[in-house]
Amino acid sequence: MASSSSRGEMEKMGIDQLKALKEQADLEVNLLQDSLNNIRTATVRLDAAAAALNDLSLRPQGKKMLVPLTASLYVPGTLDEADKVLVDIGTGYFIEKTMDDGKDYCQRKINLLKSNFDQLFEVAAKKKSVADEAGMVLQAKVKQLTAATTS
């Protein structure tokens, strides 16, 4: 919940200012929710990659397998070097790493994303609180205004 000092500041604002504040806070909350969803999606993908690396490390060299080219297209292949993997570091760049380094990279990225998620979640909760508080103050002011004009 927003602090009492910010509520006091909101009560000093006019109706138009409160509407603008609420709209801005709602917009920021929506953007933060989108970012949280993107982080969640990236974390799920990295979890899948880490699981694939773990599965791959258990397979013997020379093992025949299906290699994914896309999400729905697989081609037959043979595991040539079971101790080396290519890691996508972004924007089309890949680095060859050992299996253990690849697993470690995935785990570090997952931890970073979870940390970012937690921080963004706190910011989104604060923004939502500000938006809710502005909405309540706005409703009270509108109710006051309608009561004053009808009496």
From Swiss-Prot:
Primary location class: cytoplasm
UniProt entry keywords in alphabetical sequence: Chaperone, Coiled coil, Cytoplasm, Nucleus
Assigned GO CC terms: cytoplasm; nucleus; plastid; prefoldin complex
Location(s), subcellular: Cytoplasm; Nucleus
Any one Pfam family match given in the protein's UniProt record, by short name: Prefoldin
Induction: Accumulates in response to cold.
GO MF entries: unfolded protein binding
Biological processes annotated in GO: cellular response to gibberellin stimulus; cold acclimation; cortical microtubule organization; mRNA processing; protein folding; protein localization involved in auxin polar transport; response to cold; response to salt stress
Parts forming coiled coils: 15-35
Taxonomic superkingdom: Eukaryota
Phenotype on disruption: Reduced levels of alpha- and beta-tubulin. Altered development patterns and disturbed microtubules (MTs) organization. Hypersensitivity to high NaCl salt levels. Increased capacity to tolerate freezing temperatures upon acclimation (e.g. 7 days at 4 degrees Celsius) associated with a continuous accumulation of HY5 in cold conditions. The pfd5 pfd6 double mutant is less sensitive to gibberellic acid (GA)-mediated mobilization of PIN2 at the plasma membrane.
Family classification: Belongs to the prefoldin subunit alpha family.
Protein purpose: Binds specifically to cytosolic chaperonin (c-CPN) and transfers target proteins to it. Binds to nascent polypeptide chain and promotes folding in an environment in which there are many competing pathways for nonnative proteins. Together with other chaperonins, contribute to the regulation of gene expression by modulating the spliceosome function on pre-mRNA splicing post-transcriptionally by acting as a co-chaperone of Hsp90 to control levels of LSM8. Required for the biogenesis of tubulins and for subsequent microtubules (MTs) organization and dynamicity.
Subunit comment: Heterohexamer of two PFD-alpha type and four PFD-beta type subunits forming prefoldin co-chaperone complex. Interacts with PFD6. Binds to the DELLA protein GAI.
Name this polypeptide is given: Prefoldin subunit 5
Species annotation: Arabidopsis thaliana (Mouse-ear cress)
Lineage, broadest ranks: Eukaryota, Viridiplantae, Streptophyta, Embryophyta, Tracheophyta
Gene designation: PFD5
